[in-house]
From Swiss-Prot:
Broad class of the protein's primary localization: cytoplasm
InterPro entries reported for this sequence: DnaJ, DnaJ_C, DnaJ_domain, DnaJ_domain_CS, HSP40/DnaJ_pept-bd, HSP_DnaJ_Cys-rich_dom, HSP_DnaJ_Cys-rich_dom_sf, J_dom_sf
Cellular location(s): Cytoplasm
Domain (J) ranges: 5-70
ZnF start-end (CR-type): 132-214
Names of the cofactor(s): Zn(2+)
Binding site for Zn(2+) 2: 162, 165, 188, 191
Protein known as: Chaperone protein DnaJ
Gene3D superfamilies referenced in this protein's UniProt entry, alphabetically: DnaJ domain, Heat shock protein DnaJ, cysteine-rich domain, Urease metallochaperone UreE, N-terminal domain
Signal peptide limits: none
Function: Participates actively in the response to hyperosmotic and heat shock by preventing the aggregation of stress-denatured proteins and by disaggregating proteins, also in an autonomous, DnaK-independent fashion. Unfolded proteins bind initially to DnaJ; upon interaction with the DnaJ-bound protein, DnaK hydrolyzes its bound ATP, resulting in the formation of a stable complex. GrpE releases ADP from DnaK; ATP binding to DnaK triggers the release of the substrate protein, thus completing the reaction cycle.
GO biological process, one term: protein refolding
GO molecular function terms listed in the Swiss-Prot or TrEMBL record: ATP binding; heat shock protein binding; unfolded protein binding; zinc ion binding
């Protein structure tokens, strides 16, 4: 690696600390490892340079000499014909485990496998969501085969240990590369990673251990749920394999809107219409709530759009105590198509209030009372 700057190879500045050198090497070793870049000669050369640079910069004595005299003193001293030569990979075994099968990237498939979760959407009416309801749902899920008790083998027969992988579910393959000998681990093709061979598969589940079943499940939905809420039913999902735990069933709630009420959190809103005269004089109205009708006194002088609160008449708080409130919005209706008597009354009301009339209003009044005479 003639005239190469080892610090530059690792993406570092001269004088970098030991910790910085280790971190840089770790990152680059993963990126350019030959097993991750099969057939890529450029990556292979880059990997070789990275290791050569690390051999020097990770050794205090070599690093000191390099800092004083440069890389020329170490050219050709990196890798011998035996692969990595004297390079010490101590402390970096976890990097190479992912390529050699020693780390967590290789999964064993002969142990218990947990079942998958299931999601099911339930649509409720507004009232069902407010008061709570019991719903029967139908779920299609994978369950342990009763015929073979989930073993996958026909009753009266048994499994045998896979002779290829000796029951581990994995096989190790040694390969020679320009950088030396590498051992990789892969799933055993003969037993598909289970570690066992089923000589006579179960006639019901065909050796799988699980079968599809349609089940009816009663779900108790509490009062106060709303659209977007999710209820977990533990252990009601897909069954596991080889003794694995079952998954969960998640009930996603969807609530149909009400024609009369609007819901915001645990509060309910409703509009009620009253006449202009009742708004001015005050009146008693009947208000519909989710629990039935109640009486409410609207005070005189109420303006259109005014909100009145009915405390505790809202929706129950899920898994808690108390309820929200109901808000009543008063809409004051302005009359249309007034008859002569109604108009006269309004003109009289305007005069009683001391309101000034513009020319058009005065003209209408004159014509109106003129016709009366």
């Amino acid at each position: 690696m003639a005239n190469k700057d080892y610090y530059e190879v690792l993406g570092l500045q001269k004088g970098a600390s030991d910790d910085e050198i280790k971190k840089a090497f770790r990152k680059l070793a993963i990126k350019y490892h030959p097993d991750k870049n099969k057939g890529n000669t450029e990556a292979e050369e880059k990997f070789k340079e990275i290791n050569e640079a690390y051999q020097v910069l990770s050794d205090p004595e070599k690093k000191s000499n390099y800092d004083q005299f440069g890389s020329a003193d170490f050219n050709g001293g990196g890798f011998g014909s035996g692969g990595f030569g004297g390079f010490d990979m101590g402390g970096f075994g976890d990097i190479f485990d992912m390529f050699t099968g020693g780390g967590s990237s290789t999964r064993r498939r002969n142990g218990p496998v947990n079942g998958n979760d299931i999601e099911y959407t339930v649509t409720l009416t507004f009232e069902e969501a407010v008061f709570g309801v019991e719903k029967e749902i139908t779920v299609n899920r994978s369950e342990s085969c009763e015929h073979c008790n989930g073993s996958g083998a026909e009753p009266g027969t048994s499994k045998k240990t896979c002779p290829t992988c000796s029951g581990t579910g994995q096989v190790r393959v040694q390969r020679q590369t320009p950088l030396g000998s590498f051992v990789s681990t892969s799933t055993c093709d003969r037993c598909s990673g289970t570690g066992n061979i089923i000589e006579k598969p179960c006639t019901h589940c065909r050796g799988n251990g699980n079968v599809r079943k349609t089940r009816k499940i009663n779900v108790n939905i509490p009062a106060g749920v709303d659209t977007g809420n999710v209820m977990p039913l533990r252990g009601q999902g897909e069954h596991g394999l080889r003794g694995g735990s079952p998954g969960d069933l998640y009930i996603r709630i969807n609530v149909s809107p009400s024609k009369e009420f609007t819901r915001k959190g645990n509060d309910i809103y409703i509009d009620t219409h009253i006449s202009m005269a009742k708004a001015a004089l005050g009146t008693e109205i009947t208000v519909k709530t989710v629990e039935g009708n109640v009486k409410y006194t609207v005070p005189e002088g109420t303006q259109s759009g005014t909100l009145f609160r009915l405390k505790g008449k809202g929706v129950a708080r899920v898994n808690s105590t108390g309820k929200g409130d109901q808000y009543v919005r008063v809409i004051v209706d302005i009359p249309k198509g007034l008859n002569q008597k109604q108009k006269e009354a309004l003109y009289t009301f305007m005069e009683a209030c001391g309101e000034e009339m513009d020319e058009n209003t005065h003209s209408f009044k004159k014509n109106l009372f003129g016709r009366k005479k």
